[in-house]
Amino acid sequence: MDDDIFKEARKERDDFEELMNACDLAKMSVKNNEMVHGLETFGINGESSENGNKEKPKEIMKVVAPTVEAYVGSSSAQTPTKSSGGALDGSDQQEVRQDGTSVQKDDNGFVFYKCRFCGLTFNFMNTLRAHERIHDVSQPYVCGKCGDSFEFACQLEYHAAQHSEIDGYKCECGRTFFSYTEMLYHKHTDDPLELIGAPETTTIKVSKKRVLPVSEQDLPQPAFVTEGYEPKHPLRVYNDVRSKPYICEYCSKSYSDSRGLAYHMYSHRGEKYFNPRASRYMMGREGVGYTDSRSYYLFPRTSGYVTPRF
């Protein structure tokens, strides 16, 4: 039983090796533009034959890989040259857009975009635009009608609309503009170099006479030197006011604000013994000060009490 399993496994392994060899031969034949039948020992139903006495096929089909004719630009001449070995056929349809980009379409319906500088083809227009940046061209987008070049594709699209039948300001050269200033200041190929609307050149005579320095007496004097300075608004005159105008009437101590004088007046109540609640540290505490109702009997008001004014 085990021998049968091993024999079947070896047979499958040998069949797999023959299949891989056949695939390698097929790849090489496609690469060399021809198909060579190398499965003489391979049966019709996919079963290998050890004797090799199976009947060979009568006809061998020759498969030729599709060739491509792409135009490669040359530095010496502007005329394109053909080179084969791409993915398109020479009989493909080719269309040249307004910006100079050539679009090729093969028999299967695939569209390819060809670079106008080196001839490489790409599947997408965005890939072609990204590739064209490596050629270091300042204005790669060229109009197919008037030949003007632009730096960005959006500028070319805006310019291409001027050649179409649109409402706007039309020039004698055939271009149409959206605004009057664009139509007025646009240039033609046969225009002179001077700017349109520039003023006429005038000659100015410059004297080479030596200029003497101006003395201070000849300089004009400002009005405030001769007439005096008078400000727009009258200056504020401050009276002789003390820095501490709040003065106690009992001990003549002065304070800068009324709140400080009010706290000072608490010291003239006439307490007979020391109470920590009457100290200056506890005066600012909420609920234990002199204004609290609970401290009324602890600190009786004497005849010398003065009502604080806030």
UniProtKB/Swiss-Prot annotation:
Alphabetized InterPro entries for the sequence: Zinc_finger (IPR050331), Znf_C2H2_sf (IPR036236), Znf_C2H2_type (IPR013087)
GO-annotated biological processes: locomotion; locomotory behavior; muscle organ development; myofibril assembly; post-embryonic body morphogenesis; regulation of transcription by RNA polymerase II
Biased composition (Polar residues): 73-84
Cross-referenced SMART domains: ZnF_C2H2
Zn finger (C2H2-type) start-end: 113-135, 141-163, 169-188, 246-268
Localization: Nucleus; Cytoplasm
SUPFAM superfamilies: beta-beta-alpha zinc fingers (SSF57667)
Keyword Nucleus recorded: yes
Keywords: Cytoplasm, Developmental protein, Differentiation, DNA-binding, Metal-binding, Muscle protein, Myogenesis, Nucleus, Repeat, Thick filament, Transcription, Transcription regulation, Zinc, Zinc-finger
Region (Disordered): 73-102
Subunit structure: Interacts with hum-6, mep-1, myo-3, unc-96 and unc-97/PINCH.
UniProt name for this protein: Zinc finger protein unc-98
Species of origin: Caenorhabditis elegans
Gene field: unc-98
